[in-house]
Amino acid sequence: MSRRNAAEKRPVLPDPQFNSRLATMIVARLMKHGKKSTAQRILSDAFQLISQRSNGADPLEVFETAVRNATPLVEVRARRVGGATYQVPMEVRQERGTAMALRWLVNFSRTRNGRSMAQKLAGELIDAANEAGNTVRKREETHKMAEANKAFAHYRY
């Protein structure tokens, strides 16, 4: 184990455009090679597309619903016990769950078919808000794995 002190947790400031901390977090995950303004443009374009496609619904609410639907509650973690590796189900802290949901949303958006990243992100967010799409499937898969390995729950650490 490390002898150093744990790194100080920096507060996430709300996004200046949408006044949302989740927006700041997804911009950080969308960003490639430090190009933050490009990531912010992708997000704002995606939000415009969401409001067009969902008959003027608030895109920030759609986004927050999508993140809520994609956030896992349990996950499995590998634990080595006497030469055997067990997949131990563990509860996910809210912070980590949100981070996982955002990471999945961005990654599955990138693998989608579409013209621009904004269109792909908008599509994935709308699907996740409607409890469909790859991101929600990934969360369900994670929950199923945890359920299947419930027998090893007593190995929790």
Curated annotation (Swiss-Prot):
It is found in: Plastid, Organellar chromatophore. The keyword Nuclease does not apply. GO terms for molecular function: rRNA binding; structural constituent of ribosome. Pfam families: Ribosomal_S7 (PF00177). Keywords: Organellar chromatophore, Plastid, Ribonucleoprotein, Ribosomal protein, RNA-binding, rRNA-binding. Disulfide bonds: none annotated. SUPFAM superfamilies: Ribosomal protein S7. GO terms for cellular component: organellar chromatophore; plastid; small ribosomal subunit. One of its GO terms (biological process) is translation. Gene3D superfamilies: Ribosomal protein S7 domain. InterPro entries: Ribosomal_uS7, Ribosomal_uS7_bac/org-type, Ribosomal_uS7_CS, Ribosomal_uS7_dom, Ribosomal_uS7_dom_sf. Belongs to the universal ribosomal protein uS7 family. PANTHER family: RIBOSOMAL PROTEIN S7. One of the primary rRNA binding proteins, it binds directly to 16S rRNA where it nucleates assembly of the head domain of the 30S subunit. HAMAP family: Ribosomal_uS7_B. Part of the 30S ribosomal subunit. This is Small ribosomal subunit protein uS7c. The gene is rps7.
